[in-house]
């Protein structure tokens, strides 16, 4: 089983001013959902791991969050793909929990729920905290997409400075990430 763990805000959807509190405020980045659907159709299990501190701060409630995620799931399904699950941390940074990225709690929950080896996991996101959380449990393939928080990064060589986890691959967007992953999988299959 291969699992691709995506960050949500800034990776799948356009970042809002503060918190995305309604389904109408959740706007996908062009091409992002198509890339997710493509990976899903290629046999990847797609899982979302997202910090949602607006819950802990009372800015958004769980019903609104579920409505946002329902919209996201339906849009991916309309493209022939599937998101298997959404894992979220509801805590604010002041709560010092073990699930708020960059802490590894969400990634551990995903690994344990699916019963997969770290070698079968790939993490992709636009935020340092997402990749740090994945690196903390030993996810071997880390992928930065230069959207959202990383949109202003200038990484001409593809080599990221500290504190980015060593070996992080850099892609312009999720379409480029999907191209990379599917090409790598095809090359691996051809080699056998």
Name these PLM-found stretches:
Residues 69-85, 157-183:
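Structural recognition of alpha->loop->beta junctions
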Residues 20-21, 54-59, 131:
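Short, solvent-exposed loop/turn segments at secondary-structure junctions
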Residues 37-41, 77, 135:
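Anion (oxyanion) recognition and catalysis
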Residues 1-47:
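Active-site neighborhood of HAD-like aspartate-dependent phosphohydrolases
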Residues 1-8, 179-192:
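Non-catalytic pre-domain segments flanking phosphatase-related domains
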Residues 32, 36-72, 82-98:
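Substrate-recognition element of Asp-dependent hydrolases with the DxDx(T/V) motif
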Residues 123-169:
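Acidic, Mg2+-coordinating phosphoryl-transfer loop and its flanking beta/alpha structural elements
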Residues 101-134:
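Conserved Lys-Pro-Asp/Glu-containing loop-to-beta segment of HAD-superfamily phosphomonoesterases
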